[in-house]
């Protein structure tokens, strides 16, 4: 059955819908553009067929500028009163713009009173669905009651959006719940390109979506974005009155940004909320505050029966409803590639999250950064609630979250209400849970016992936890560090550390009701940190038992010690095992003020108990666990304990200093190798000009040079590369002798593959002579020879980018000479097959010398480098092949040679660290002492005056490679 929508006006309400109807009414939707501002009349349509209706689009349908808000019979543009309603887009556009109504669902509504769950409303197959500036206002009854109406789309039936390309709900407004969509069950899935709820607002609850049974945002490949939505009371973007909300499998991420309400800045839920297996989940700049409000309607809506809880959950509020009696309602975030809560704000509690039961686990990365609240800068757990944090697939980090109650803000990650607790606190091997902001807790109820929390449990559904839990003041500014509250965490819970590591760093304090430690776990403390029991009225017997305590040597400053303090009146402190020592960094002993001298009575550990019950019977102070640092100050420790004060101190005996690899500076001596390598490249480019020719010539050559030395046991990898130009002149001064003069410039850079980078500007000059008659009278042993001297002066600059120290910079100049003397025996050929002109066996003596003077860096940790030089003598032996092309006078040359280094003084220099007087030798790379040389050049005459040429070469050693490429042109006179 088919009919046109323009004639399909049904207003009567039919019998209740039936699930097993024989046929569905099929309606063909026209391709139209209805614009009320042009006077075109829109046929408001009501569907009431209990068999259900299938609307099939034949094209795009645009509906704009309609207003029936003042009508006593105000209605939706499309209304359904019976049967299921399916709207099939067929790739078309479905658009509503500037629609105003005083009915529920300004654009579309489906209100079924009997068995609504059997009559779903569905939208599928649209290229675009647009609901822009649709407004649902209030209406009054004959009894003068004001009824607030809701949403652009309203349904008492399940609602489904599936397989659409783009969905946009923008700038919609309503007096009732949900400005964009309100329904019992809302499912949006398989959206392909865009899913955006932007700028929607409700005077009451649910700025974009309101659901009473379920909200599902699942399996969308499009980004899911809720932006700048707002409400007058709850749920800036989403309001869930019961049931559950599932956001899962969204491939391009989920983003809630700039949403606002009085509670639940982005989401307010009285049902379960689950985020799972999305690519990215981000909540940014959402706010929950009593000051957040849209203008109230006139007259205002009836006040709620329960006083609103305002200013809670900057991003998400998730608790059971006040009535009926609370049931298990939880917020779960798991399986995400990344989770980010950034700069969300709540005026009261939970800058990011506020919930009775919250679980965050199995995410690859979780970050709470810069969130703010009165209590619980990132997370707040109300009375008797619970929180589970598991870093089992990635790290969890809390940093720069703030609590602002009055006066100066303080750092605060989590706040536990009265009797609230951790249900799970753990990290698996290789992952860490970082608390750079402390945890705060309300006091226990008078009759309540402290809950027991197993930290890093041995066995769980996720396997054994053996990762690290860190409490640290590392990211505090100097001003923040001066306030103890910024680094003091309080947990009114009994902690049992079963596995992994609990680390207290950078001045952090952890107060717990009771603390015990399993033998397979480790407690690491910095000097200046404290592990203590709480000292409130509800904790009279809290105790601390440690069996594997480790002190971080990085943190020692000679004044502060790690402190273990049992503050409860009857509690005992028991410590056993061997005191461990750890270095968090390989250069921990580079503390000049601390370790550059022998030390006595260095504070290490203080053990305290209000009851004076401190047991150290099985506590050992042996130094077997101390491993000498491979770098920095070398020495030995000796520890003692005062049995009266229970204070552990240490004596340090300095034995020497070993520089960290970052200080070794191989680039300084290697700069001499760079000079020699550059001059060899210049020599090859000059020889490639083709010097055994009559007449005079002037050539200009572009030079490129690349060198890499491999990492060896004695030296790290080294790379040098550069480019420049050579201007060369040539003249034959006698029939048997020629002279060549050249000069040029190179621009180079080098690096040592760790922290050193160098740049240089090289100026050079070269002199060449060639003799083509016998060097020994009538002897034909050498019938020709060449000689060349090349000099360079380079201006060097090196920057050392230390990992922890300020960058070091220095500059200086190097001088380098390269002398070459060659004897050869040309053999003239006339080969028609290879067209070879000649073969020239040769032997050459090459002497290279480079030197630099003293050098000093310009930082407090700067080094002083002494004089250094390089001397290398090589004797290349090889053969040169010359070939004429069939289009003479073009010719080609190939050189193959073996070049052993018969003598070498490898470059090095004495290095001093003035800040402590330590000295060592900086050593350059020791290249393999033999090399294979292969070069090729080509010359092409453009005319009798102009010639162009190219040259390439490689120098292959077992531990290094050098490559050159030169292109030039020559003028003959």
From Swiss-Prot:
GO CC, any one term: extracellular region
Autotransporter domain location: 691-973
UniProt cross-references to InterPro entries, sorted A to Z: Autotransporte_beta, Autotransporte_beta_dom_sf, Polymorphic_membr_middle, POMP_repeat
Predominant location: secreted
Residue ranges, annotated region (Disordered): 284-303
SMART domains per the UniProt record, alphabetical: Autotransporter (SM00869)
Compositionally biased residues, Polar residues: 284-293
Secretion signal, residue range per the UniProt entry: 1-24
Pfam families assigned to the protein according to its UniProt record, in alphabetical order: Chlam_PMP (PF02415), ChlamPMP_M (PF07548)
Superkingdom of this protein's organism: Bacteria
Entry's family note: Belongs to the PMP outer membrane protein family.
Protein name, as recorded: Probable outer membrane protein pmp13
Species whose genome carries this gene: Chlamydia pneumoniae
